[in-house]
Amino acid sequence: MIRTYYDEMYDGAGQVRPHYREFARWLADTPAELLAQRRREADLLFHRAGITFTLYGDEQGTERLIPFDTIPRSIPASEWRVVERGCIQRVKALNLFLTDLYHDQRIIKAGIIPAEQVLANEQYQLAMQGLDLHRDIYSHISGVDLVRDGDGTYYVLEDNLRTPSGVSYMLEDRKMMMRLFPELFAAQRIAPIDHYPNLLLDTLKSASPLDNPSVVVLTPGRFNSAFFEHAFLAREMGVELVEGADLFVRDDRVFMRTTDGPKAVDVIYRRLDDAFLDPLAFNPDSMLGVPGLLAAYRCGNVVLANAIGTGVADDKSVYPFVTEMIRFYLDEEPILQNVPTFQCRKPDELSHVLANLPDLVVKETQGSGGYGMLVGPASTTAEIEAFRARIKAKPQAYIAQPTLCLSTCPTFVENGIAPRHIDLRPFVLSGKETRVVPGGLTRVALREGSLVVNSSQGGGTKDTWVVED
């Protein structure tokens, strides 16, 4: 099968797109050895700064550098404005869905989404039922994963509402590009992103009804794959980075242990999953959480960002209903479309999936990080048949989608520059207002032909420029 990919830098006639012309001129005039030297400098600087991630399942548990590519992904400002509006619209609808789900459940009563699809979902938290949240916001920090098909149309691949990660790489990639190639930023107007930590802190503070709430970042600890990001964001916001053992609950209030005695905590930006937050309420074996945290939360004495139970809205089995959520709650047409999705829990759609596995991408509804998925066109017959057996055994645990022709962007590889597939994760902050920092994290599949961009699967990152037209 011949696939047509949308190239971010070159049009169908091989001409450089207008928003890339300045970069293309610079690239043509810059000696190859200088580019190679700067790339080596970037690797060294990232290593010194500790910009790493830990690969789960790695026997050595080693920290790895996320490969950084110095050819940016560039988006014209006019195009970005549409993407931005689409992301804001989508996250607003998802927050309205969560408010409705944990209160009146109008969308279920209207027959738009089946009750069992959400109420039997393992991410649904009965403890949240009837609990009112300040501003009715459940997902304060959201990541919306976008891809472009062969004709350049943006699609939402998935929503990330639990503990979306990657924003630290977005910020560090920009700092690295400005340090190594300042002349590029002097030659054109590229939207800044360095104000993200200030926006994040403002969002977290606005999540509390208090005038000047105390904010902390709760991390599972240094062995977590995203620990660098937890420490980075706490430092950039000027707030404390804490582990569960640093906090305790007394009289349904959360306190932080300090050398000066207990200090009240009002907002927790938590970077661990629901199951580990409170051993008294969730997983009793958790050593990462804070005993009594749920009780304090239900009393309204502490804010958790993101809220407990947000995961039900970004579950892949709920994803097919998001465009209907937009119509139901906002009375608007979706600006960004979903990828067509087959739900294996439905017998007719299951039959279609099983008959077309070599052409489809199949995902576990609870999967993440590029794990638990089948990319049909890139799989062997044995891999496809093994996955077929898994789907038949538990069809409700899988969805399937057509294999998209993900857009490509020129990327440095071992033997020069070649196109590699990319996606985009803009970060949406929901507080007094809903805001998106221009661009986001561009992830790139460095292996030739690969469509999997996750760092856990060998993917890298690029700086993302929003360039004035």
Task: Write out the residue ranges for each language-model feature.
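Preference for protein termini
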Residues: M1-D469
